[in-house]
A protein has these predicted regions:
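Conserved redox-active cysteine motifs that mediate thiol-disulfide chemistry
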Residues: 39-56
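A short beta-strand-turn-helix
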Residues: 21-35, 99-102
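Bacterial N-terminal signal peptides that target proteins for export
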Residues: 1-9
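Bacterial N-terminal signal peptides
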Residues: 8-17
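Thiol/disulfide oxidoreductase modules built on the thioredoxin-like
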Residues: 83-88, 94-138
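Conserved segment of the thioredoxin-like fold in thiol-based oxidoreductases
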Residues: 49, 59-95
Length: 143
């Protein structure tokens, strides 16, 4: 599978388009929306504990949550691993980190909070809860 990454600027807002595991372009971030980007792997026990929290965050809030497989799995293998982890939000087939100016995480899970302008405001290492992510987001968003 060819990795495709598009970076364009519209009105001063960074628009990063990456491929999802469904082979669709996904804009990260969409103007006006905060994004949560989570790095995970099937062998990561804390990731398994964290995914239900991220599923709740995705279902119960306006934050848009994305999953990035740390091992770089693609296609059917990526979809299978995401299903094994019960990920209920969009799974990206490529790492948006380089375009966001973020190095590959050294510890899993790692979660990025990305503001509507495409800037990473926080890099959170270790498992997060819906409550901790909401508290950080509210502080950054000024709620």
């Amino acid at each position: 599978m060819t990795r495709r990454l598009k970076i364009i600027a519209l009105g001063g807002v960074l628009m990063l388009s990456v491929m999802s595991c469904e082979d669709q372009h996904v804009a990260l971030p969409a103007q006006g929306h905060w994004r949560v980007v989570n790095y995970w792997a099937v062998w990561c026990s804390p990731c398994r504990e964290e995914i239900p929290e991220l599923n709740r965050l995705h279902q119960e809030t306006d934050l848009v949550v994305f999953a990035v497989n740390y091992d770089g799995k693609q296609g059917e293998e990526l979809a299978s691993q995401a299903a094994t982890m019960n990920i209920g939000f969009r799974v990206l087939a490529q790492d948006p980190g380089p375009a966001l100016g973020v190095e590959r995480p050294r510890v899993l899970p790692t979660t990025l909070l990305v503001d509507p302008a495409g800037r990473v405001t926080d890099t959170l290492v270790g498992p997060q809860t819906q409550e901790t992510l909401l508290a950080i987001w509210r502080t950054r968003a000024g709620d």
